[in-house]
């Protein structure tokens, strides 16, 4: 398993962070908090229902910064962004909680989820079952498992922990080898294909298109990274990919939800979903 240098650095720091968190709050207490958290909102179902209707199932990301691009959004109010995304038609939210490399925070996830009715994925680097229980405790409805960061045994353990606390799993792959491992190890219906090469940081939508034929029809493909314009969306929809994770394009816009609506709904003349949240 070849782990990119940047990812190695993140994972090394993440191991330290998990140890620090565990020292502050023990697992038993986190489990208690998880049991008392609001019920999961059904992340996978929210995407699957849209995709069945061949409508855009957008996971809209709330991300202040990234290691490669620096700060993406100076005016960063998670609750405000969440409401904007919901009005714009997002199916789900993704909230970065990694502190050191993405300037994220657990509080951002809590604030975003409290401001809307959408399911939320905790976007972080999961390497320990403690983090999975913690995700449920802070209100997450889904977690991300990055195949390039995990061996098969740990990946299966983390997925089992997620299932035990009622969390959905989005598994992320970058190439055919990772895809094969993911399909063999996990039964989650959500398979994310990251179009960004973690070694070079180059983005190519061909990554999704190349891997599509290898994915069983009972799995939902989520294309991640590189969706910047209407042509990108249409390229995916022609190939029957209806689930998208988009962050940077929205974070750089004055009104993230309006940009979501424009990119995925306005130019197709579709009725905007979620414009009247409960």
UniProtKB/Swiss-Prot annotation:
Report the EC code(s) recorded for this entry: 4.1.1.48
**Gene3D superfamilies, sorted:** Aldolase class I
Q: Name one Pfam family in it.
A: IGPS
The reactions it catalyses are: 1-(2-carboxyphenylamino)-1-deoxy-D-ribulose 5-phosphate + H(+) = (1S,2R)-1-C-(indol-3-yl)glycerol 3-phosphate + CO2 + H2O
Which GO BP terms sit in this record?
L-tryptophan biosynthetic process
> Which keywords does this Swiss-Prot/TrEMBL entry list?
Amino-acid biosynthesis, Aromatic amino acid biosynthesis, Decarboxylase, Lyase, Tryptophan biosynthesis
Q: Which domain of life is it from?
A: Bacteria
Q: Which residues form the signal peptide?
A: none
Output the PANTHER family linked to this UniProt entry: INDOLE-3-GLYCEROL-PHOSPHATE SYNTHASE, TRYPTOPHAN BIOSYNTHESIS PROTEIN
- Which family is it part of? Belongs to the TrpC family.
What is the protein's name according to its record? Answer: Indole-3-glycerol phosphate synthase
């Amino acid at each position: 398993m070849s782990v990119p240098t940047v990812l190695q650095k993140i994972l090394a720091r993440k191991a330290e962070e998990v140890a620090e968190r565990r020292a502050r709050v023990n697992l038993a207490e986190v489990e208690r908090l998880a049991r008392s958290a609001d019920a999961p909102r059904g992340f996978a179902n929210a995407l699957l229902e849209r995709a069945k209707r061949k409508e855009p199932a957008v996971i809209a990301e709330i991300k202040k910064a990234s290691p490669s691009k620096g700060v993406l959004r100076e005016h960063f109010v998670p609750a405000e962004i969440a409401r904007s995304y919901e009005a714009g038609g997002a199916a789900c939210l993704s909230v970065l909680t990694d502190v050191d490399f993405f300037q994220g925070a657990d509080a951002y996830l809590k604030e975003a989820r409290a401001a809307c009715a959408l399911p939320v994925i905790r976007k972080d680097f999961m390497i320990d079952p403690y983090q999975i229980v913690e995700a449920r405790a802070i209100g997450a409805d889904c977690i991300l498992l990055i195949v390039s960061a995990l061996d098969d045994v740990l990946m299966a353990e983390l997925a089992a922990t997620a299932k035990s606390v009622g969390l959905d799993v989005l598994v992320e792959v970058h190439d055919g080898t990772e895809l094969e491992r993911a399909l063999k190890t996990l039964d989650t219906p959500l398979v994310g294909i990251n179009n960004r090469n973690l070694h070079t940081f180059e983005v190519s939508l061909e990554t999704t298109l190349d891997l599509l034929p290898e994915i069983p029809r009972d799995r939902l493909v989520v294309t991640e990274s590189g969706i910047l314009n209407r042509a990108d969306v249409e390229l995916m929809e022609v190939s029957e990919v209806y689930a998208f994770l988009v962050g940077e394009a929205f974070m750089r816009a004055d009104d993230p939800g309006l940009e979501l609506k424009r990119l995925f709904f306005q130019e197709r003349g579709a009725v905007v979903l979620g414009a009247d949240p409960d």
